[in-house]
């Protein structure tokens, strides 16, 4: 018989830097999950993406066991890294903070494809382009 899911927890954690301190500890602790086991597994599976924020969806079962699915890093983080900026613009319609090329845009869209609600790479590129525009990042050819 399949195990019954009692909770689904969504967190965005720095890759390779999960520790039992808040926000991870309290979020998992209230469901009785072994926090250290989660931290070790998460850090091992994200060791190749250090420096990125990697969202994770944790399913907690009745017997306090858990499974988790890693998502792709947020588009905004990927855009910031590509443009070499610290953060997006406070007023994107007036002040531009950086720019990325179409090739970089395509690369980000390909990386985000599994988590985007898009059927082809062109649609994914339009979604990422919108995110970039809202951050004050211009797209150059």
UniProtKB/Swiss-Prot annotation:
InterPro entries: Ribosomal_uL11, Ribosomal_uL11_bac-typ, Ribosomal_uL11_C, Ribosomal_uL11_C_sf, Ribosomal_uL11_CS, Ribosomal_uL11_N, Ribosomal_uL11_N_sf. PROSITE patterns: RIBOSOMAL_L11. One or more lysine residues are methylated. GO terms for biological process: translation. SUPFAM superfamilies: Ribosomal L11/L12e N-terminal domain (SSF54747), Ribosomal protein L11, C-terminal domain (SSF46906). Keywords: Methylation, Ribonucleoprotein, Ribosomal protein, RNA-binding, rRNA-binding. One of its GO terms (cellular component) is cytosolic large ribosomal subunit. The keyword Ribonucleoprotein applies. The keyword Ribonucleoprotein applies. One of its GO terms (molecular function) is large ribosomal subunit rRNA binding. CDD domains: Ribosomal_L11. Pfam families: Ribosomal_L11, Ribosomal_L11_N. Forms part of the ribosomal stalk which helps the ribosome interact with GTP-bound translation factors. Belongs to the universal ribosomal protein uL11 family. Part of the ribosomal stalk of the 50S ribosomal subunit. Interacts with L10 and the large rRNA to form the base of the stalk. L10 forms an elongated spine to which L12 dimers bind in a sequential fashion forming a multimeric L10(L12)X complex. PANTHER family: 60S RIBOSOMAL PROTEIN L12, LARGE RIBOSOMAL SUBUNIT PROTEIN UL11M. This is Large ribosomal subunit protein uL11. It comes from Thermosynechococcus vestitus (strain NIES-2133 / IAM M-273 / BP-1). The gene is rplK.
